Amino acid sequence: MYPYLRTLKTIVYARFRTSLHFGDTGMINLRAGFSDIDHYGEINNGRQLTLMDLGRYDLGVRGGLMKVIAEKKWGFAVGGSSIRYRRRITLWKKFQLHSEVIGHDGRWFYFLQKMCLGDTICSSALIKAGVVSKTGLVPAAEVMKEFPDNTWTGELPDWVKAWIEAESQRPWPSSSTK
């Protein structure tokens, strides 16, 4: 089940936290609960990606993007992800979710997110997400026009460019069910 209450709590709390700008890192504290864990007693791999939504909501609210999205009747959609898991987060453990927009390619924004137990990074994800309208993906330049005081360039690190290139080489599955 989607964590609707956590999402609402994250959005409300974000309104009272320090503002962020593109390129800043946001951090929220979470605790692994019963609805997060699998039969191994750790946060399920899919749940980690779901919880990372909360970090992007926190960034969006604190950076003003969610306000722009609401005003323009836009939306926000994930277009791809790559995640690495290194350490378990078990039931009742407090952990931190760090989230940062690290760049854009003109169409998509790329987020680096990591879940940590103290100084130990447990998982790290690269998330490709875009702002969407009724007519499709909104170009990053159009989104950035809404933040005229921002000096962030959005230049992607080389490793993200390599990931984008690798993804472009991956064939899309055929529609056949065979």
What is the meaning of each model-derived region?
Residues 47-74:
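Active-site helix/loop of acyl-thioester processing domains in fatty-acid/polyketide metabolism
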Residues 36-38:
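Acidic, divalent-cation-chelating loop motifs in proteins
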Residues 23-33:
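Short amphipathic
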Residues 69-91:
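Small beta-barrel nucleic-acid-binding modules, principally OB-folds
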Residues 1-16, 85, 89-96, 100-178:
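HotDog/MaoC-like acyl-thioester-processing domains
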Residues 15-23:
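Short, motif-level signal for alpha-helix interfacial/capping segments enriched in acidic residues
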